[in-house]
């Protein structure tokens, strides 16, 4: 990553798409993480995720992700590419994405000779990368492993007390978790400020209105600008932001 790029604030990216949990009381918030809860109202088709061990000796692991099965019954927040919407069936087809993030203490203590588990270049399966060199830039809060992305390595940026992957365009390095068909909550809400960098958010409520708004612009709901929130396995909120 070029020095001038490293000095830029990493703005305009989605709020945490990592599938981590918290209380169901905050499930309606587009910027809060959510925890698993009760069963979904209807079954959802999915592709399976390869599970990974939560511990590995000598390897720094990313913060644990929720699985597709958990999303189908729980309350979560994640980046998604919405591919279709059916107002009559009150359901949406989408591809779920995540990115690797790490506890601050794990990255601060990482040294050459150790390893870090990561999804390189957005690969579906994670790999263990041996750390040959590590450079910490306190001014930019960026940690470059094996020369950073400019030299085929990895750059991690510290945000919200965690480190996450970052690309040249300041986005996280998204990888595909799998595909889901999820029902829409009858009180679903949509907040859309994607029309411009300073655009006011357009608020839409209810299954029919939200389905119509999403369906009218179906090719423009991607992992880079769209965050989906679920409550008890139903889509309860969609947030779309402007991206350059």
Cite the ranges covered by each PLM segment:
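Bacterial N-terminal signal peptides that target proteins for export
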Residues: 2-10
